[in-house]
A protein has these predicted regions:
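Short, amphipathic C-terminal "tail helix"
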Residues: 180-182
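Extended two-metal-dependent nuclease catalytic cores across DNA- and RNA-processing enzymes
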Residues: 1-177
Length: 182
């Protein structure tokens, strides 16, 4: 429905989540001097890593403010080490199946975190690689990246003229009042 009525490119890929698609597009805008402006409308902290690109901004609709991150690379490393319970990515001290088996993660204290920045056991390094694959949006497999970029370049957005009728039909008064911002 959105794809047919809103004048924006709408992408989906059967083997990629939305955050992967956004990560691929943000990275793609760095190529060939494009640097198209990218605005991510989401409060999801996973996107902080993309703020390393000067043309990428993130706005949190829930907080009604732009998300800032002074050190996106450091944030990414911290996210890899500490994991992300919301996305069921365990910290690097914990086993792969910790959430599936309903066990508690090994507690990641500040001291353990600092130690993991410089030294890791073989298991911790394996878990670091596991988490990097799951968390780092630049690690999307190349064939999926290629598909996403191809879709991005070929998809044709709906004509602008369809938007007003769609918003009226859906009774989106606030959006109708702001239609010039589309």
């Amino acid at each position: 429905e959105i794809r047919e009525n809103v004048p924006y490119k709408v992408l989906q890929h059967e083997r990629a989540e939305a955050d992967d698609i956004i990560g691929v597009i943000a990275e793609y805008t760095q190529q060939f001097g494009r640097h198209d402006d990218v605005l991510i409308l989401s409060g999801d902290h996973d996107f902080k890593q993309l703020l390393k690109y000067s043309n990428v901004r993130q706005f949190s609709p829930m907080q009604k403010k732009f998300v800032e991150c002074k050190d996106p690379a450091g944030y990414l490393i911290e996210h890899i080490i500490k994991g992300d319970k919301g996305d069921e990515v365990p910290n690097i001290l914990s086993r792969d199946d910790v959430f599936v088996s309903d066990e508690r993660q090994v507690v990641m204290t500040a001291k353990r975190f600092e130690a993991c920045l410089t030294e890791r056991t073989v298991d911790q390094e394996r878990n670091y690689q596991r988490n990097e694959t799951l968390v780092d949006l630049s690690k999307c497999p190349q064939d999926i990246k290629d598909d996403i970029i191809d879709s991005f370049e070929t998809v044709i957005p709906a004509p602008r003229g369809k938007l007003m009728n769609y918003l009226v039909k859906k009774r989106c008064k606030q959006l109708i009042d702001s239609i010039g911002e589309f």
